[in-house]
Amino acid sequence: MGVTVVSHPLVQHKLTIMRKKETSTASFQRLLKEISLLLCYEVTRNLELTTMSIETPLMPMEAPVLEGKKLVFASILRAGNGLLEGMLDLVPAARVAHIGLYRDHDTLQPIEYYFKAPEDIVNRLVIVVDPMLATANSAIAAIDKLKERGATNIRFLCLLAAPEGIERFTKAHPDVEVFTASIDERLDEKGYIVPGLGDAGDRMYGTK
């Protein structure tokens, strides 16, 4: 399905401020919510529309509305919740799935500790959100789980991606399109994206 890099000037400006090491936790949270609104606009750009009959204060008309499968936003905990908040502001009727994964710092492999998703996920477009696509291990594991539950129409949204992660992800799930604000240089020896922005979860919540 490929990779879409969202190059909108506002996205790039806000991402630069988020990258700065002196950006406070409060500012990081605010910027993450703002950028999630802009990224949500892009990842939902080609949703299908139909028309419905309405009446304006002046006259009846046929007006465009969303058609087809309803949305699920699937957040990879914990950092995914930062993107989720802004997206739900735009699409408050979307259902939500939570996928609890943490990365073993020695093996870099994901360990699942929680999974909760709507029962009718097979009938919905699922947009998986996680700020970082680094090794891609967590993203691959999350989408493996969603497919096990019947999801067939999936997109993945992140702030930053590493070339290594994109390569692994697209090989594992070639049917899932990736949307990101930036493809950075590489992964370091600890599996972090560089130049990156640090650990998104720690910067969101002020933890180490």
From Swiss-Prot:
InterPro entries tied to this protein: PRibTrfase_dom, PRTase-like, Upp_B, UPRTase/APRTase, Ura_phspho_trans
An example Gene Ontology molecular-function term: uracil phosphoribosyltransferase activity
Reported regulation of activity: Allosterically activated by GTP.
Cofactor list: Mg(2+)
Manner of cofactor binding, per the entry note: Binds 1 Mg(2+) ion per subunit. The magnesium is bound as Mg-PRPP.
Binding-site residues for uracil, renumbered to this chain: I193, G198, D199, A200
Function according to Swiss-Prot or TrEMBL: Catalyzes the conversion of uracil and 5-phospho-alpha-D-ribose 1-diphosphate (PRPP) to UMP and diphosphate.
Identification of the protein by name: Uracil phosphoribosyltransferase
Organism: Brucella canis (strain ATCC 23365 / NCTC 10854 / RM-666)
